[in-house]
Amino acid sequence: MHTSDISMTQDQDVSTCRLCHHNTDPNSLNIFDDTVQFCKDVSIAEVSKSLWSVQYDRNECLSELICSRCLEILEEAFELRKGMQEREQSLQEQLKEMIKDHPKHRPGLNGNPGVFVPEEGCIIVEVDPENLAESSEEEFALGSDGEYENYDDDDEEEEEDYDEEDEEDGQNGEDVDMPLGMDAAQMAAQQSVANNANTTEARPKRAFLCQYCDLGFTLPAECQEHELAAHDPNAPYCCNFCNIKLVTRPALISHIKTLHDPDRPYVCAHCRKGFVRRSDLKKHTIVHTGVRPFTCNVCSKSFSRNTNLTKHMRIHSGVKPFVCQQCPRSFQTAVEMMRHTRSHGEVKAFQCGRCPYSFSRRDKLIAHQQVHTRRDMEQQQQMGLIPPMEGDLQQQALQAKQKAAAQTKNSRYYHCDVCDRTFQRERDLQRHQALHMDSLFACKTCNQGFNRREQLQRHELEAHGPSFTCGICCISFLHQIELENHLKVHQLQHKMAQRAQEAAILPLKMAEKAPVAMTAPLVQDPQLVRPSAAELSFYSNMIPTMNLGFYSETRPEE
């Protein structure tokens, strides 16, 4: 083919429509340079690509024009797509309005669909999407002014939960002591890949909490089934102390603070442990579900919180980021550093009776006194006053003396006689000592043993059910103290009914005693207010069903 023929063919191709390859008119538009009215600021080539996914490349040998027929088809397709998107968006908004009040689709903490509506007092924290780790206490403290005033107590509770995770469930990985000269990477290489995979697959990955009682589940279906079956849609919030049902969460918290526990109104549904804030209760509930998504890559031990994993990793790395401002000592956790800082300003009130040394803490004094005891025993053995003792017997003698000194009156610190751990409360020491025993708490029904009181209570509730029943409303409870608290509500209702009857009868008695010609209005006692007809009907129907003899306050005649 000659050059003139190639030029003729090229001119003919350039003058045709790029979309349909038909001839174009002189008023045709350029698909790369021109824009249309129905889609401004976007070229025709980009509109065609978004509709039909066809990429048009610019080349001097190819046409850049579009005919009027293809332009009309392009406009119709664009308007059709735009209308479909608007109609679908409108349907989705109508669907949200229809299902937002249904219990199954209420927004909550368990992954239910719906529009998130923050509750009263809710703290919204912006989180980096690339670092979706669990927030620490310090991050939440920045968003509230008065909620985190007791910082020391919060840290101690967080440290206590960390110890509870570390002690209660240690089968994920054994405690590994890092040899000298070996870093974390070499230690991780020695771990078994198969054991790590089995441990990761055995544990659930996520916890789902009930939006009404914060009960934890590992499956969303179980959580939704619990919300529909265990909670009344009209009054879904139930008190864990007296089983009274309320409509809103603020009403429930006000009820608990007024009648039951003003300091810790948020109660765990598993073990009845109380918390100051609901965020602490949520973190504690995850421990009961067994969900531990944060795993140590050195010893394969897993944790339910990222903050606890960070503290645990400092054991392997040896990093102590918290440094005392008054001395060169450093610590792995903020709780240890704060406890040490208090020792600088405190008066050393614990004086050793055998030397001039004094200490600010009782446990330090006890550890110091053990040095004197050990020296006395060595001197007596050298002088032949007592026979030499075995190493285990000496250790047992020191542990017995330590335990006796720790449990004296007004003692603030309690020591474990097995592993030398120290606790500030005696109940924490008892709960820790249960881990060293086979079974400390036994079920009275089936004699099954448990290491913790919370496990025994959970077993009694799930296996045997409640055993104390109210004789008035037939509500059952697991413990007698719960029944007694519940009966106080009936007693209060009974007193209110008596006052209502007295207020209704008093005007009639006063009218009978007054003269007939007396026209002055009757003056009632301001403390006795006449109830409405609905209240009188309610109390009159309720009083015959009550066991009034149980609430009788009259003493028998002598």
Curated annotation (Swiss-Prot):
Phenotype of null mutants: No visible phenotype. No effect on cuticle pigmentation, bristle and hair distribution and size, shape of tergites and sternites, size and constitution of eyes and wings, or fertility and survival of males and females.
Biased composition (Acidic residues): 132-177
Keywords: Metal-binding, Repeat, Zinc, Zinc-finger
Zinc fingers classed as C2H2-type: ranges: 208-231, 237-260, 266-288, 294-316, 322-344, 350-372, 414-436, 441-464, 468-490
Gene Ontology terms, MF aspect: DNA-binding transcription factor activity, RNA polymerase II-specific; RNA polymerase II cis-regulatory region sequence-specific DNA binding; zinc ion binding
One Pfam family here: zf-C2H2
Name the record gives this protein: Zinc finger protein piragua
Gene that encodes the chain: prg
